[in-house]
Curated annotation (Swiss-Prot):
PROSITE patterns: 4FE4S_FER_1, 4FE4S_FER_2. Residues 68-96, 92-121 form the 4Fe-4S ferredoxin-type domain. Transmembrane segments: none annotated. It comes from Methanocaldococcus jannaschii (strain ATCC 43067 / DSM 2661 / JAL-1 / JCM 10045 / NBRC 100440) (Methanococcus jannaschii). This is Uncharacterized protein MJ0578.
Amino acid sequence: MDYLGIIMKIAIISGKGGVGKSSISTSLAKLFSKEFNIVALDCDVDAPNFNLMFDVKDKKLLEVIYREIYEINDDCIRCGKCLDVCQFDAIGDFKINPILCEGCGACELICEFDAIEPIKRESGYIYEGFVGFPLIWGELEVGESGSGKIIEHIKNHAKKYKAELGIIDGPPGVGCPLISTVKDVDLALCIVEPTKSSVNDCLRLIETLNFFNVEYLIVENKKGMNNINYPFKIFHSIPFDFDVPKLIANKILLCDSNSKVSESIKELYEKLKEFI
């Protein structure tokens, strides 16, 4: 599927956090960049770390994302109708809490005195950096919502590169951010670790991908950490290695290390090239 100028898009995702998704995606991005014209997108906007692993120094602010909320002005006569209609308990003492307000506009509609008006509030930011290839990532402001909207804007900014390949570090879970990330990708890599919670969450992830007709492969990370029988087919396994936390702490990509994990990720890369 060719959209936004990117010929093929691969999303690296997981049913739960902490399984090594970003560690794998950063290494795959670097490996693919040696043979393909790529753009990397970090769509885990609640906790982006792609830029941290590549230690981006000169980041550029591409866009500020706003959401619409409401505030009460001096025309308020304190009738209380807005308090009754607000479903999010965002109005107290005739002031609207900007964190709780979802911007539905019910309060403005019911107010007979034009005492409630919309305002814009910063909800997130989109940045760009270059690490041998272009990297675009988003950051959701603390306490804000609208991660799906930010992800859509990240994708729109990627179109200018007309890349052969888009490597997307997606969010964990099966919520709105995940759906915004995978709904139009060509291939999803589902990262799972040998724990019951990871397996159960991966099953939910597979169900979501099937609903949206997204092709996927399952990659086991930390193989050997625990014995477990998977209820799905494993495409590739990456071994458990005690040195991985040290490598990450020192901002060393797994593919650049002299470890068994590095060799396994390179093997995964060679297998993935067959899908391009």
